[in-house]
Amino acid sequence: MSAVLDLVRDLIARPSVTPQDKDCQQMLAQRLARIGFQCETIARGGVTNLWARRGTQGPLVVFAGHTDVVPPGPREKWDSDPFVPTERDGYLYGRGASDMKSSIAAFVVAVEEFVAAHPQHEGSLAFLLTSDEEGPAIDGTVIVCDALQARGEKLDYCIVGEPTSTHELGDVCKNGRRGSLGGTLTVKGIQGHVAYPHLARNPVHQFAPALAELVGIEWDKGNEYFPPTTFQISNLNSGTGATNVVPAEAIVEFNCRFSTASTPESLKARVHEVLDRHGLEYDLEWDLGGEPFLTARGSLTDALSSAIQAETGLTPELSTTGGTSDGRFIAKICPQVIEFGPTNATIHKINERVALDCLDPLKNIYRRTLENLLLAH
């Protein structure tokens, strides 16, 4: 059995549904300590975080990941127990197989091999692991980044083990992510009888023209790395349930996924301008889930791309699509952040799985990336 497969099986067998860690990090810390890592647990709010570092000199290469997984859903719909790693038809099945316990296992083994071959390597290595990536993400990576910044630890490169590959290992890596700006809008009206609309003020009718304008706006044109910003209504609720009552208010929840071509302030200003111009009486609460980040082509993208090409023969696409990740926190303290891992077709789904024949190549890509970054210095 490969060392990566052995480790990922151990991790899957620990039912670490967010924010639980189920001693995944403790097991990994003990393993890393044997090859010279200094390990530190940072816990808050029921969340466990691990910062493990080997070396004190720069450059510092960090692997970031999460030991928590999403709930399995109805277990009876799985073909095998989601927390009993099962090999079948060339795949390893289990919750977290792709997202992202295989990446963690591959990087740990890659580091073990790298240190064994190059015990006096220049620079430093580190792991940043959390059990709060799939949850609210308020006691996880963000507080570790705050602690590192407060004590002046300088990160140079970070690889986040998110499952970025689309069709086969190595076809896509993420060199950035869009930002997320949510809003909860309450449009105020006057409740009344539908037969006497002149004695009421219907907030749905009032908001409809503004809604049509908002969904038709071209917020920006995107840029070389990002698609244009999008605006989507996710929920729209109004009324009492009765068919003869004009509602007193309409509550609208929306989200903007935005690129570096826009800022949260510019998006907020445009929304308020539309609402004000339509004469609406409203309250609007904003929630900035994360700002966009981007790592332009450079030493980290080149190191990873070269490693992928050497191992798979593929030239990876650099992409910024998809949802948010913990990379948004790390990018504030690390100038170069990239995400790379196995295929993502089954993440969060029933029968989540990872191809068995990608585990060792994934480990090799991570190891080659370390060699490209640290042995050239």
Curated annotation (Swiss-Prot):
PROSITE patterns for this protein: ARGE_DAPE_CPG2_2 (PS00759)
Gene3D superfamilies xrefs? 1.10.150.900, 3.30.70.360, Zn peptidases
| Positions with a binding annotation for Zn(2+) 2 | 99, 134, 348
Q: What does this protein do?
A: Catalyzes the hydrolysis of N-succinyl-L,L-diaminopimelic acid (SDAP), forming succinate and LL-2,6-diaminopimelate (DAP), an intermediate involved in the bacterial biosynthesis of lysine and meso-diaminopimelic acid, an essential component of bacterial cell walls.
Q: What is its EC number?
A: 3.5.1.18
Give, as in the UniProt entry, the pathway in which the protein acts: Amino-acid biosynthesis; L-lysine biosynthesis via DAP pathway; LL-2,6-diaminopimelate from (S)-tetrahydrodipicolinate (succinylase route): step 3/3
Active site at: 68, 133
Required cofactor(s):
Zn(2+); Co(2+)
User: What do we know about how this protein assembles, alone or with others?
Assistant: Homodimer.
Q: Which HAMAP family does the record associate with it?
A: DapE
- Name of encoding gene: dapE
Q: How is the cofactor bound?
A: Binds 2 Zn(2+) or Co(2+) ions per subunit.
Listed under catalytic activity are: N-succinyl-(2S,6S)-2,6-diaminopimelate + H2O = (2S,6S)-2,6-diaminopimelate + succinate
Q: Which NCBIfam families match?
A: dapE_proteo, PRK13009.1
Per UniProt, the keywords (alphabetical) are: Amino-acid biosynthesis, Cobalt, Diaminopimelate biosynthesis, Hydrolase, Lysine biosynthesis, Metal-binding, Zinc
Instruction: State the InterPro entries in the record.
Output: Bact_exopeptidase_dim_dom, DapE_proteobac, Peptidase_M20, Peptidase_M20_dimer, Peptidase_M20A
Family indicated by similarity: Belongs to the peptidase M20A family. DapE subfamily.
Span-the-membrane segments of this chain are none
The enzyme's first-digit EC class, named in words, is hydrolase
From which residue to which does any coiled coil extend?
none
Domain of life of the native organism: Bacteria
Q: What is this protein called?
A: Succinyl-diaminopimelate desuccinylase
The UniProt annotation places Zn(2+) 1 binding at: 66, 99, 162
What's a single GO MF annotation on this record? cobalt ion binding
GO biological-process terms attached to the record: diaminopimelate biosynthetic process; L-arginine biosynthetic process; lysine biosynthetic process via diaminopimelate
